[in-house]
Amino acid sequence: MKRYQAYKDSGVSWIGEIPVDWSIKKLKYYTTTNDEVLTENTAPNYEFRYVDIGSVTLQNGIEHYQGFSFEDAPSRARRIVRTGDVIVSTVRTYLKAVASIQDDKDVIASTGFAVIRPKEVDSRFLAYSLANHYFVETVSSRSVGVSYPAINASEMVDIKNVLPPNDVQKCIADYLDRKTAAVDTAISDKEKLIQLLEEQRTSIICSAVTKGIDATIKMKDSGVE
């Protein structure tokens, strides 16, 4: 169901029609990329939380960190991130490793990520738009290589994306924050229920194989603890 009075063709096949007051722009025109890196002059004892490609999923964002000091860290641990940035994998793009940075304290990302920094866009809207299935698939489809597909950051930010007016970006981000929080809560509740059911299942099996299914039968000591 259409929610706006007038639409126009976006000119991008995977986007289709968009409201007339929305824009289609290449990512590089409203963001910056890979702005900050650790240099070789970094103090050897500088300690940080490292994010590698394998630490990130599209569904959960950053799932875990690895602690390193600069002198012991992998050579690819170089990209400085800030709160509001979005990291998108440029190598092994089939893994769809995309995450927004919520806490930037001593966090360093792998050079296998492009660090996308909002410039003329709401940071939350940017995070949602780059985690969009169609954008992620576009990145993957433009990657080169079979066993180790990769895309240059400069090519990634050349991809066109939807850019609504600023007030609409905020409204969309607010809406998605509420909806995703509700879904996350529902998932958590379901997981707790599943755990309880699994415990009940285990208990039923244990009871049946050790005591039988007749609750009225007289029991005796087995002699086994």
For each predicted feature, which ranges?
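Short amphipathic coiled-coil heptad-repeat segments
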Residues: 1-18, 181-225
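Amphipathic alpha-helical segments
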Residues: 20-27, 126, 157-192, 198
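Sequence-specific dsDNA recognition surfaces
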Residues: 10-11, 28-40, 51-83, 101
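Short coil/turn segments at secondary-structure boundaries
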Residues: 40-48, 141-143, 219-222
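A short beta-sheet element
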Residues: 76-136, 140, 150-152
